[in-house]
Amino acid sequence: MNTIPYVVEQTKLGERSYDIYSRLLKDRIIIIGSEINDQVASSVVAQLLFLEAEDAEKDIYLYINSPGGSTTAGFAILDTMNLIKPDVQTLCMGFAASFGALLLLSGAKGKRFALPNSEIMIHQPLGGAQGQATEIEITAKRILKLKHDINKMIAEKTGQPIERVAHDTERDYFMTAEEAKAYGIVDDVVTKK
């Protein structure tokens, strides 16, 4: 059962009721709290564009608790983060894995955070192929290119040598918040706002 809480605010005109996500959006907070798919990506992209239109100078806060998901959906979010003018601060609360971790490390430099008990995981892209041998070969080439591109991105954003990133992402590579800070995925582990 998915229950979305509502909050009530007093205004000059009386009471106003918001679902919690709309209320957080007023404070420029976007939450990714699920697997990243096309629907989640469309919602996050729309929120990023809306907040840029509202005020292109103020930071946007992206809170992440996600096991990852679709690379194409994830890149839609990541490319929009890079496209818009406001800095996007990222915060891992709980778990940022796979593309969730890529979004976390793609926040504005100096503004990437994790809560103390967060866990971060990077790995190579997952995929499958079926059909004729030629189709399988095409898919294999695509996923190998994607693996290289993602490793390069992680290396650039963290300052780690690409050889280390390639080695670490061969399998699921789990990190605590402090280990993610040492790796360069986040800039700080926060305990207070």
Swiss-Prot record:
One of its GO terms (molecular function) is ATP-dependent peptidase activity. InterPro entries: ClpP, ClpP/crotonase-like_dom_sf, ClpP/TepA, ClpP_His_AS. The keyword Cytoplasm applies. Keywords: Cytoplasm, Hydrolase, Protease, Serine protease. It is found in: Cytoplasm. The keyword S-adenosyl-L-methionine does not apply. Its EC number is 3.4.21.92. The active site is at S98, H123. It holds the Pfam family CLP_protease. It catalyses: Hydrolysis of proteins to small peptides in the presence of ATP and magnesium. alpha-casein is the usual test substrate. In the absence of ATP, only oligopeptides shorter than five residues are hydrolyzed (such as succinyl-Leu-Tyr-|-NHMec, and Leu-Tyr-Leu-|-Tyr-Trp, in which cleavage of the -Tyr-|-Leu- and -Tyr-|-Trp bonds also occurs). GO terms for cellular component: cytoplasm; endopeptidase Clp complex. CDD domains: S14_ClpP_2. Cleaves peptides in various proteins in a process that requires ATP hydrolysis. Has a chymotrypsin-like activity. Plays a major role in the degradation of misfolded proteins. NCBIfam families: clpP, PRK00277.1, PRK12553.1. This is ATP-dependent Clp protease proteolytic subunit 1. It comes from Bacillus cereus (strain ATCC 14579 / DSM 31 / CCUG 7414 / JCM 2152 / NBRC 15305 / NCIMB 9373 / NCTC 2599 / NRRL B-3711). The lineage of its organism: Bacteria, Bacillati, Bacillota, Bacilli, Bacillales. The gene is clpP1.
